[in-house]
Amino acid sequence: MKYLIFDFDGVLGDTNASRIEVIQNMEGKSREEAILSGDQYFTKSTHTRDLNVSEESLSVMKDWTTKFGNLLHQNGFNLFDDFIKELKKIKDVKMAVVSSGSIIYIKPKLEKCGLEFSHMLTFEDHHSKEEKVEQICKDWNIPVKNAYFFTDTISDVKELGSIMDKNRIYGCAWGYQGAERLSEVLDENHILYTFSDIHKISWILK
């Protein structure tokens, strides 16, 4: 059995253009400012487990995420349908999604994509991706280091590299930060340049 956990935005969901528009509207930023602030956030997450976020700050983050989620859902976006098609070819697999985004825009898309995800854990469930990955692996009854993770951001690689097997963390070049930025934390054998590259992975089945 293969155990695959996916980030959503930029990996399964083609949300970048819509996200930039929403950030511009929510925060009054120019397109360039929205892109720059996004790259900074995707390089160093502001809500990892070790940051000890206060309840007050967490409440503000949740309110922001809800507003963002509603606007992104209204604005609309597509999935990376060709990647979804490649994932459907993988046999003997369990899949899950963890995201710092909102269930508001993620769940409606994934429910219709034809893939089965045992979990869709978002910011509403916990602010830390470490916590969410650990919960999924606990429910799957496997060690965390047995799961694979697919992301498009440096911050995810840094955050989850402390608890997961780094050899099972892969970057998706079609996502937010692209191959050049991902190459700062991943070697080329751990970057998927095309959707079909996922079939080049030599799965470790334990």
PLM region spans:
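A short, structured active-site edge motif that brings together acidic residues
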Residues: 35-39, 115-129
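Short, acidic loop-to-helix structural element flanking the phosphoryl-transfer center
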Residues: 70-103, 107, 111, 130-131
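Structural recognition of alpha->loop->beta junctions
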Residues: 114-123, 182-205
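Short beta->alpha linker loops
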Residues: 78-82, 101-102, 124, 128, ...
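Conserved Lys-Pro-Asp/Glu-containing loop-to-beta segment of HAD-superfamily phosphomonoesterases
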Residues: 130-160
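Acidic, Mg2+-coordinating phosphoryl-transfer loop and its flanking beta/alpha structural elements
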Residues: 150-195
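N-terminal helical cap/lid subdomain that shapes the substrate entry/recognition surface
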Residues: 2-81
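Short amphipathic alpha-helix with an adjacent loop that forms part of the alpha/beta core around
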Residues: 134-139, 200-206
